[in-house]
Amino acid sequence: VAATVAVGAVGAAVRLSQDDDPKLRPGGALALSADDGSDVAALETGLRLQERSSGVLQSEALPTSTYSMAAVTWARPEDRPEVLVRARRSDGWSDWTRLPVVEDRPDDDPAVRTGTAAWWFGPSDAVQVRLSRGPAPKGMRLVLLHPASRPDDELSPRTAARRSTGTPKAPRPDIRTRKQWGADESWRDGSPRTNRTIEQVHVHHTVSGNTYSRKETAALIRGMYRYHTKSLGWSDIGYNFLVDRFGRIWEGRAGGIAQPVRGAHTLGFNDTSMGVSVIGNFEQAAPTEAIIDALGALAAWKLDAYDRRPRGKTTVESTGSDKYAAGRMATLRVIDGHRDTNDTACPGSKLYARLDDVRDRAHRVIKASRAGRPVDEPEEPEVVGVVEPARVGGVAKPGKGLKVLKGRYDPDGARSSYQWLRDGDPIAGETAWRYRLGQADLGRRIAVQVTTRSGSRT
C-alpha cells in the first residue's frame, strides 16, 4: 500500500491504484554524510531519469541511508518541472507527493539555484523521483537531508516577551532564537543587510509537510537552513521568522529579531518588508488558532514599531517580480500573502483565507497596548504531541481491507478515534480502525482522520 499522512488533525490516506511496489536497484545505498561538527547529514547527487510513458520521466527506486527530507534542485529559474517524490518508510512506500517549486528567492543574486520545497517525509531509506511534465531541466540534482534531533531541542527556554517602558507599543511575543534551534553560523555567508523601514508583513508557508512533531521542529528548521544555504546557494535561511503548527515563533534570518533584516522571501519586495513562514502545507491543512494568534502577535510587534496599520493598505515600489515589474508601484495590504506579490499559490488557500483574522488579531494587540492595557500573549495550547504519526496499512483493492497503523503520542496513553473519508467526505458509520473497501471506492481517495485526546488535550 502506498500511504501518506494527511493533515489537519492527524490523518492518513491512500488512493487505489495499479502501481506495484518498485524493485530497488542492485548495489549499495546512497549514503548521506554530515560536515564536521554538524548534525545535519546530507547528500546531493545527479538524477538519471527514464521515460515511463508519454511525457513522464522517472528514476529508479534508490536505496539510501536514513533521510527525512527530500528536494530537487536545478540550474535555471525559468524551468518549471512538475516534480513528484515518494519515500520508503517503515510501513512501505509513501504516496507520490508533488513538491512545489520554491518561489521565495533573493532579489539580487542570479547565481543561486532553483528547486522544490524540501519536504518532510520522516525517517526513510529509499527514494524515487518522477517528472510528470518534462523535459528534465539542466543541472537537476536530488537533495536528501537528515537533521538529527538533539536532546535539548525542547529544553531551551523561550525569549521573554519584552514590554516597553516608554511610548506604549505592541509587546514582543515569545520567540525562540537561532541559538535555540541550533543554527550553524558558519553556513551563512556575509553580514546581514537591514532595510530602512518595514511597510509590510508577507505571510508564507514552507510547503514542507504537516506531520512533524513538536520535538522534530528544531531539527526540521536546521534541515531547511542547510537546504537554503548549501543547496540553493542563499546567504542564509530566507524567512525572517517561522511559526510552527503548534503556534511557536522561531527566529529565521540572522541580524537581530528587533532589526528590519532584509530576507529572501518575497521577490521584488524584500527591501520594505518582513517575511514569516508557517511550517507546513496550508493548501492541504487549515491553520490552527494557535498559528493565527502567533502570526497576529508577531505582525503587531513588527508593524507597530513603524506605526503601520495591520488592517490597512500601503503603496510600495517593486524591484521586480513575476507579477510587478521593476519600478512599478503596487498598492497592497499591510499584511498580505505571498501570492499578492508573486505568481504563486503561497501561503496556501486555507491560510490565505484566514489573513483577515491575522489582521484583526494584530489590530487588537496594538489597540490594547495603546490603551495601556497589558496584552496577554496567547498561551501555547495544550495539545497531544505526535511522536510518530499514524499510517494506513492493508491492501488498496476492492474487497480488501485498510487499517490504521497506530502512531505514538505524547503523553503515552492518549486515546484515538477514527473517521474514514471518501474524497474528503465522511463515510457514514465508518469509525472503526479498520475499513473494508468496496467498488464505490475504486479510483477514489480514501482517508482516515485520526483524532487523539488525553484529558483536555487534543
Regions found by a protein language model. Name each.
Residues 376-458:
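Ser/Thr/Pro/Gly-rich low-complexity disordered regions
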Residues 9-18, 135, 139-206, 238, ...:
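Basic/polar, cationic surfaces and motifs that engage anionic cell-wall
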Residues 75-80, 124, 134-135, 409-415:
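Short proline/glycine-enriched turn/loop motifs at strand-loop junctions of beta-rich domains
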Residues 64-70, 80, 198:
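Extended extracellular/luminal ectodomain segments enriched in beta-structured repeat modules
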Residues 8-13, 58-66, 82-84, 89, ...:
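Beta-sandwich interaction modules
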Residues 1-2:
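N-terminal export leaders
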Residues 187, 195-231:
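Active-site acidic/histidine clusters and adjacent loop/turn architecture
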Residues 9-42, 370:
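C-terminal region of N-terminal signal peptides and the immediate post-cleavage residues
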